[in-house]
Amino acid sequence: MYTLARQLLFKLSPETSHDLSLDLIGAGGRLGLNGMLCKQPAALPVSVMGLNFANPVGLAAGLDKNGAAIDGFAQLGFGFVEIGTVTPRPQPGNPKPRLFRLPEATAIINRMGFNNLGVDHLLERVRAARYNGVLGINIGKNFDTPVERAVDDYLICLDKVYTAASYITVNVSSPNTPGLRSLQFGDSLKQLLDALAERREQLAVTHGKRVPLAIKIAPDMSDEETALVAAALMASGMDAVIATNTTLGREGVEALPHGGEAGGLSGAPVLAKSTHIVKVLAGELGGKLPIIAAGGITEGRHAAEKIAAGASLVQIYSGFIYKGPALIREAVDAIAAMPRV
């Protein structure tokens, strides 16, 4: 059924198709239809960050930026749902067109620019949802906030989403907000992580619970840079790392229609690069922090490869656009079939 739906949706512009799909998934969730229409994955519970996941395959941030379809996505069989990226204030994002399909490569290029309705609106949607599973909320900075004051935006969002989230992801790796990726390195990263850790401890006392913090990083880093990030995450007391966001690279898509568009490339072409980052992180972290792997999972076996590389959980987005809910089941089945260590 999804194959037919995709054929129809792919006749529309990518962003129109995205918005319509989100509306349909949200409506199906409100009516309780998605679970009946989609075969559910096998149960494969796992505990990570002190949280209990129904299965290790989650929805990556970016597909549901405003929390419009939380129940709908959960009913499709995801083991966890991550919404956002959300910013303190609403913002329109970059000018259109800003989303491009590369079907020959099972890939997408986007330069959305954190378009969202703001953190207050997102919280309204979270409160309206019935979903009681693991919910991640991905936070970022507004476009017009100077990078020197980015910490302020992250702390505003952290304060607001703290009690609503199962875990909180700090997005310092989108290539579509100028200067954002500089926060992954050196003193900028240390200052951000220290500020987040200090505020989180204050919030934990106030609210009587410690919400895990995950940092989402880019795939476009050297092994040495990745090692430095891993050390900083451990030193600051972060709880997980999400590897990875989209890539600025264009290997394998340069000659394709839209292959030269500016923005972040996701989907199949980022698989090897992203999985390499997971392997490097696993070696550096030595099991002290869990890794949530995202990037290039378009077949079930890719999810198993991420777990074999050292990840505890995986997330999908572009693969879901191309393959639909069946990819969730395939990924869960592939992970379940892995030899027990």
UniProtKB/Swiss-Prot annotation:
Topology of this chain in the membrane: Peripheral membrane protein
GO molecular function: dihydroorotate dehydrogenase (quinone) activity
Biological process annotations from GO: 'de novo' pyrimidine nucleobase biosynthetic process; 'de novo' UMP biosynthetic process
Superkingdom of this protein's organism: Bacteria
Any Pfam family: DHO_dh
Cofactor names: FMN
Pathway: Pyrimidine metabolism; UMP biosynthesis via de novo pathway; orotate from (S)-dihydroorotate (quinone route): step 1/1
Location(s), subcellular: Cell membrane
EC number: 1.3.5.2
InterPro entries: Aldolase_TIM, DHO_dehydrogenase, Dihydroorotate_DH_1_2, Dihydroorotate_DH_2, Dihydroorotate_DH_cat, Dihydroorotate_DH_CS
EC category: oxidoreductase
Binding note for cofactor: Binds 1 FMN per subunit.
Annotated binding of FMN, by residue: 61-65, 85, 138, 171, 216, 244, 267, 296, 317-318
Catalytic activity annotation: (S)-dihydroorotate + a quinone = orotate + a quinol
Amino acids binding substrate: 65, 110-114, 171, 176, 245-246
Active-site residues, record numbering mapped to chain: 174 (nucleophile)
One GO CC term, this protein: cytoplasm
Assigned keywords, A-Z: Cell membrane, Flavoprotein, FMN, Membrane, Oxidoreductase, Pyrimidine biosynthesis
Oligomer status and interactors: Monomer.
HAMAP family according to UniProt: DHO_dh_type2
Family stated for the protein in its record: Belongs to the dihydroorotate dehydrogenase family. Type 2 subfamily.
Reported function: Catalyzes the conversion of dihydroorotate to orotate with quinone as electron acceptor.
Protein name: Dihydroorotate dehydrogenase (quinone)
Native source organism of the sequence: Pseudomonas putida (strain GB-1)
High-level lineage: Bacteria, Pseudomonadati, Pseudomonadota, Gammaproteobacteria, Pseudomonadales
Gene name tied to this protein: pyrD
